[in-house]
Amino acid sequence: MTLAPADLPVSLQPLVDRALARLAQVLTEPIPADLLPLLTRLAVASDFALDTLVRQPALLAQLAAPGCPPIPAPVLDPLQPSDWPAQLRRWRAAMSTRLIWRDLAGLDDVAQTLAGATTLAEDCLRLALEALQQEFAQRHGVIADDQGTPQQLVVFGLGKLGGGELNFSSDIDLVYAYPHGGESDGPRALAAEEYFARLGQRLAKLLDETTVDGFSHRVDLRLRPFGSAGRVALSFAAMDQYFQREGRDWERYAWLKARAVAGDIAAGEAWLQTLRPFVYRRYLDFTALDGLREMKAAITAEVARRELHEDIKRGAGGIREIEFLCQALQLIRGGREPALRERRLLVALDALVAAGQIAPEDGSALREAYLFLRRLENRLQMLRDAQTHVLPSDALDRERIAVGLGYADWNVLRAALAEQQQRVSTEFAALLAPRKGQAAPDALANYWRSLPEGSNAPLLAEAGFLDANGADQSLRDFAQGTGVKSLSDAARARLDRVLPALLHAATRSPQPDAALKRVLGLLQAVLRRTSYLALLDEQPSALARLVDVLARSALLAERLAAYPLLLDELLDVRVSGPMPDAAGMLAECQQVLAVEDPESALRWLNETRLALSFRMAMATLDGRQGAVDSTRQLAELAQAVVVTVLAMAEADMHAAHGGIPGGRFAIIGYGSLGGLELGFGSDLDLVFLHDNPAGVDASDGARPLEPGRWYARLAQKVMALLGAVTAAGRLYDIDVRLRPDGGKGSLVSSLASYTEYQRERAWTWEHQALVRARGVAGDASLLADFEQVRAQTLGRERDTGVLYADVLKMRGRMRTELDRSDAARLDLKQGAGGVVDLEFLLQTGVLARSAQHAALLQPRDTPSLIDALAVAGFLPDATAQALHGAHATLLDVGLACTLDRRPRLAPTTPAIEEACAAITAACRAAELPFA
């Protein structure tokens, strides 16, 4: 807006004339003509700014300087404490006027004005605290910790101060703390509690007290533990105890934005990290909505009681609703998604959009509304430096606000405000509304509430349960179990809403009885975790999705019951989106390497693996991808985990024993891991290699180990980490029997001994296994050396007669010992024409032809091996196409069996018969009559 004196509404002209006349009286020079437009806008927008210029005439030249630079901060003389209040207040008034000037001149947008107000408050806090600390040190001494380091007060800023988005005339929410107890060492010694409490009270008074120069900042200390009844300053230990025992839901919202703003900032930020589990729960936490409902109800009651309907902060569609909406979504998901742990609202809003929790168009609307409301809020407060959020009732004030913001009149501004408030109200109501969509009590709900005394098998039969008596008994047993009986009233109310809805969903599933059994198993597991009951209560769509998954997959039902954190995945928008690629999965896994606590890091890695494999299972179950893709992804995930675990183990070894200078270590994946065809729950076939440089006989740490022991210890650590049981389960079972000499051989083979073994002593079946082997983790140069050894081993000339005889003998032995097929069912893996027949065919082709066709040495996975053998002429093109289809069919059926916890013994169907026939025909054509 460009408002020149000639553009003023007639009604505002007298006000501006009086303002400019007042200013002219105190200036030694006439008002420069080029400043008149901006001073006109200032006169319309702010009595406070004009009053400040009248009191500090020299300020005008500073504001008019190019770029409107900051006003130098005052120096608070320790010898003149009586001057401090005036110095702080005059500087704050000057800097606040500068904020108004920059806003009106278009130098700052809304976000910059909020940041400027925050910085000003922090600077005033810092100046005041530093001066008071010197005074206290002279009078009372200092309080040192056990190492003799002086302690400082820690000042936490909450609310908008913590978020860096302070409005123009806001109070500042402060909480005082200190690291440790103790006593000061001065002539008038004080205990730490008294020392820091007095210091904090003096700080608040120095900033807050109104004098002839006004005030610096209004200080609110009521957000401290126990509120106004609590101690003014608490030790970190006392703060910890409070939040462990007394912390309430609304305090999670308050401390979400907390930031150390003065004093010992480093200590404060370190302590805030310890508070993070209180603010952000480890799992999706829909109980946060309960706290939000309580706070919103209290605010609504206050608005009604105090007739604050014109309040743009607390009223409907106001600033507070945007803040609550973002903070609630942050609290729900921030424990799982670090990107959401953000103090700044606009940054948090962007993160919520990026995480899929707010639609992009809704995020844009909320951003626009927030900036609109904050700009209006600032202008209301700039008028007279008043902490107000209420629209003015005075006609002249209304016109000043509207014209100052660039609107033709108040009605136009009011209409724009109403539009923004409606947007906010709609979004906020949607957040709190989901449970209202659940059906009113019906027959199934009344039946559940009658248990365990009641019984109504006919009702369950009518609802669709085949074994109605069994379902009735299961529900009665569940209702009278200690888990249900020990629920709090609030949790029981949630269960009473959730369980009937689950029953309805079960009756609509293809297998109602199985769904009910699995639902009750899951509920039994989560009864003590009210956050999961809250999730199902607040999110009916998740409830329906849950029952659908439980009905179709016994494996996922077991995993959900064992690890309820997977319920989070049902609400994750990514569960229906594309899977991350191998690099993306590695990046997700390696986030744990930044966690200092090894136990927490391992648990997080387990949770990451669980979540990613769950998403793969869901994609497979829903038919969004075939088993070939899923098994490849599972192998890539396993490799990412192994790489991460190796890094953890190496860090542990280096910390304890140092490293082997110039030494190399690598992990080779065999079997399904090497062949990129891993199943759900498959173990990992691993072989460990090392290469130790000549002349190095020990590690270089404080507790050195000779190289052989060092590498063995490293491999053992890798295996221990992969197999360790955590709250999120274990990563993988490990099989190391494919190493040279099997169980009798060394756990870690040197590259030289491995090379010699493959050249001189390995059996044919071991060379078959080598076809799918590939390096998965460790030193890149050693992995390259392994590839060379593998190529030399597989690519040598062979006696095909001996090769075929060995392969047929081994396959016959396996068929006899492992095939579980019967007259009606086929063992998908070991049966005639099954997966192993196909693997043996391909492995034989590689061993027989790679001496002449080096390209056969590159692929490891079945589809690529089929293609390569077709190019090499080992398989006709038509046969290769048939084998691709057969492989996909058997893998799809096998993975479906795994997902439903059925053995991979499948009733023969036309598709399975066709697949087996194709594999059997290909084997016979290659002179490998396995069947």
Curated annotation (Swiss-Prot):
<dbReference type="InterPro" id="IPR043519">
    <property type="entry name" value="NT_sf"/>
</dbReference>
<dbReference type="InterPro" id="IPR005190">
    <property type="entry name" value="GlnE_rpt_dom"/>
</dbReference>
<keyword id="KW-0460">Magnesium</keyword>
<keyword id="KW-0067">ATP-binding</keyword>
<dbReference type="Pfam" id="PF08335">
    <property type="entry name" value="GlnD_UR_UTase"/>
</dbReference>
<keyword id="KW-0808">Transferase</keyword>
<dbReference type="GO" id="GO:0000287">
    <property type="term" value="F:magnesium ion binding"/>
</dbReference>
<dbReference type="Pfam" id="PF03710">
    <property type="entry name" value="GlnE"/>
</dbReference>
<feature type="region of interest" description="Adenylyl transferase">
    <location>
        <begin position="441"/>
        <end position="931"/>
    </location>
</feature>
<keyword id="KW-0511">Multifunctional enzyme</keyword>
<dbReference type="GO" id="GO:0005829">
    <property type="term" value="C:cytosol"/>
</dbReference>
<feature type="region of interest" description="Adenylyl removase">
    <location>
        <begin position="1"/>
        <end position="434"/>
    </location>
</feature>
<dbReference type="GO" id="GO:0047388">
    <property type="term" value="F:[glutamine synthetase]-adenylyl-L-tyrosine phosphorylase activity"/>
</dbReference>
<protein>
    <recommendedName>
        <fullName>Bifunctional glutamine synthetase adenylyltransferase/adenylyl-removing enzyme</fullName>
        <ecNumber>2.7.7.89</ecNumber>
        <ecNumber>2.7.7.42</ecNumber>
    </recommendedName>
</protein>
<keyword id="KW-0548">Nucleotidyltransferase</keyword>
<dbReference type="GO" id="GO:0005524">
    <property type="term" value="F:ATP binding"/>
</dbReference>
<dbReference type="GO" id="GO:0000820">
    <property type="term" value="P:regulation of glutamine family amino acid metabolic process"/>
</dbReference>
<dbReference type="InterPro" id="IPR013546">
    <property type="entry name" value="PII_UdlTrfase/GS_AdlTrfase"/>
</dbReference>
<dbReference type="GO" id="GO:0008882">
    <property type="term" value="F:[glutamate-ammonia-ligase] adenylyltransferase activity"/>
</dbReference>
<keyword id="KW-0547">Nucleotide-binding</keyword>
<comment type="similarity">
    <text>Belongs to the GlnE family.</text>
</comment>
<dbReference type="InterPro" id="IPR023057">
    <property type="entry name" value="GlnE"/>
</dbReference>
<comment type="function">
    <text>Involved in the regulation of glutamine synthetase GlnA, a key enzyme in the process to assimilate ammonia. When cellular nitrogen levels are high, the C-terminal adenylyl transferase (AT) inactivates GlnA by covalent transfer of an adenylyl group from ATP to specific tyrosine residue of GlnA, thus reducing its activity. Conversely, when nitrogen levels are low, the N-terminal adenylyl removase (AR) activates GlnA by removing the adenylyl group by phosphorolysis, increasing its activity.</text>
</comment>
